[in-house]
Design a protein with these regions (language model features):
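Histidine-acidic metal/acid-base catalytic patches
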Residues: 1-3, 8-12, 17-29, 151-172, ...
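Active-site acidic/histidine proton-transfer and metal-coordination neighborhood
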Residues: 73-169, 242
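Acidic (Asp/Glu)-rich catalytic clusters
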Residues: 22-27, 43-64, 87-99, 122-133, ...
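Charge-dense, low-complexity intrinsically disordered segments
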Residues: 12, 42, 78, 82, ...
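Short coil/turn linker and secondary-structure boundary residues
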Residues: 16, 46, 79, 112-115, ...
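Active-site-proximal loop/turn and secondary-structure-junction residues that shape catalytic pockets
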Residues: 3-5, 37-39, 68-71, 109-111, ...
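N-terminal pre-domain/capping segments
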Residues: 1-101, 250-264
Length: 264
């Protein structure tokens, strides 16, 4: 739903446009949504149960949500997650009531030291344990900066190697991985099974730039451990984001490699 943020990205826009926009997405062939607006126990300004009902009324399912409460400098220094974990309690409850399968942390800045990165990993493990206890799974969404090094270690690699696979999966954004000058498929092979969800994304509409090898990515879903994928269109080539979304999903629906991957 981040892709259509200009139409339904806050409570006011959601109230005004959600029925039309969600139905249009469903009619294009989208089957599930990933939310990107949580606050104070609500999604897009409505109760979790109402959000679930809205999505299902359009003919789709609620799958995942981008949400986080990052550690502040004092918490990072003290390694005291008490207040942060209290915040997660309400958040987890709301997402469970909304019928979510996955909760995904969308961002973490590059820390200055490996010690700080280890603290972040420890924090994510604790949050993930809470999420798992509620019957959902916690993920981390990578951009390009995670492929930078922290004290000689690639941030993405360190996070994968120092988080518990029972409590944290990784949602690779294949476009940002390419922008970070790495191969998504190489990561699937290096860390098989850790990429439960993927963001299928391009520079604009899917398949236009030629930057991303979508055929190899879809044909290695099993190696990645992917159980689902989210089409994201951060910027369309025209002002009409829904037109761009339709062009993108049509590309995916008509691609032979996508059909082959689902016929395995």
């Amino acid at each position: 739903m981040y892709s259509v943020r200009d139409l339904i990205g806050d409570a006011g826009k959601y109230a005004q446009n959600h029925e039309r926009v969600l139905k249009q997405l469903a009619d294009m062939g989208f089957t599930a949504v990933e939310a990107a607006n949580y606050g104070d126990g609500k999604l897009y300004g409505v109760a979790p149960e109402q959000f679930k009902a809205d999505v299902e009324a359009a003919g789709m399912k609620v799958m995942s949500s981008h949400v986080t409460r990052n550690l502040n400098d004092e918490e990072l220094k003290s390694k005291d997650f008490t207040e942060a974990l209290k915040w997660w309690d309400q958040c987890i409850d709301a997402h469970k009531r909304a019928g979510m399968q996955y909760m995904v942390i969308p961002w973490c800045s590059v820390p200055k030291t490996l010690a700080d990165l280890q603290t972040i990993c420890d924090y994510y493990n604790q949050v993930g344990k809470k999420v798992a206890a509620a019957g959902m799974k916690l993920g981390y969404h990578s951009h390009s900066h995670e492929f930078q090094k922290v004290e000689g270690k690639v941030m993405e690699d360190y996070m994968i190697e120092h988080t518990d696979p029972n409590y944290l999966f990784f949602q690779m954004d294949v476009y940002w991985a390419v922008r970070g000058q790495v191969s998504p498929v190489a990561y699937f092979k290096k860390y098989p099974g850790r990429f439960t969800l993927l963001h299928i994304k391009d520079d604009s509409e899917i398949g236009q730039s030629g930057m991303v090898g979508f055929d190899a990515i879809f044909n290695n879903f099993d190696k990645a451990g992917a159980k689902g994928w989210v089409l994201e269109l951060e910027h369309a080539s025209t002002p009409d984001i829904l037109k761009g979304m339709k062009e993108s999903i049509d590309y995916i629906k008509n691609a032979k490699f996508v059909k082959a991957s689902y016929n395995k």
